Amino acid sequence: TAFVLSAMMVLSLAACGAKTETPADTSTPAADATKPAEVAKLTYAVEAGSAGEEVALANGYNVVSVDSQAKALMEVQAGTADAAIIDSLMAGAMVGEGTSYPDLTITDQKLTEELYGVGCRKGSDLASFINSVMADAYADGVLEATAETYGVQAALVEQPASEFTASESDSDVQYIKDKGTLVIGITEFEPMDYQDADGNWIGFDADMAKLVAEKLGVEPVFTVINWDNKVFELNSKNIDVVWNGMTLTD
């Protein structure tokens, strides 16, 4: 199983659906997701293996599971789902006027709140290394400045002081240094991990992962993974770290 690091942010989940002001000659708008009587009739698009899927199933919602939060929004846009349950930070970046989904809206339904961190192989000293880098970045203001760049500063939690402790044997940190790359498993998740116009990975998580790679003296390599397979990808060493909104209960 994966070992999850100390919390970096507090995230909540948001339900996103069609605007009720959609003209009558277009597709029928979704019902108000805040009304219990209507919730049972709705179909929610969720990312497989995510906290959103867990919450939806626990509440008895009808769900369609897809392999990314971005695709959950696509399901709503296409009319194959009434609403999507995604992380609130992503909803704020991708839903509403001036975004990729201007015809969708975020409901005021607060589903859950969670702490998230970064996932490494169980027992990996990379966890200790990343914690030390994040602690330093918090202390010198780099973490907050990066969060402000992507509008997520309100979700930051304090990073306690931490010193790196290397493993005496089977060191992941040494393994990564020897091969010269830090392979970062992600899913596309604006404003955390997404591509700019030139195809470069940017976002709060992406920039923090690049900082860790810099401190390791290696090149960062981003690879999109199936979120449901994250533990397998880690344990098989296809990736070195999962860095994309991983909840601390994973």
Predicted regions and their residues:
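A ligand-binding cleft/hinge motif common to bilobed small-molecule-binding domains
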Residues: E54, M74-A78, D82-T112, N229, ...
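Short loop->beta-strand "edge-of-pocket" segments that line small-molecule binding or catalytic clefts
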Residues: P36-A48, T181-I186
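Periplasmic-binding protein-like
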Residues: F129-A154
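Secondary-structure junction motif
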Residues: A45-A58, S88
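Hydrophobic core
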Residues: L5, M9-L13
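Bacterial lipoprotein signal-peptidase II cleavage site
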Residues: A14-A24
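Extracytoplasmic small-molecule ligand-binding "clamshell" domains
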Residues: D25-T34, N59-S65, E75, D87, ...
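A bilobed periplasmic-binding-protein/Venus flytrap-type ligand-binding module shared by bacterial periplasmic
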Residues: E113-V133
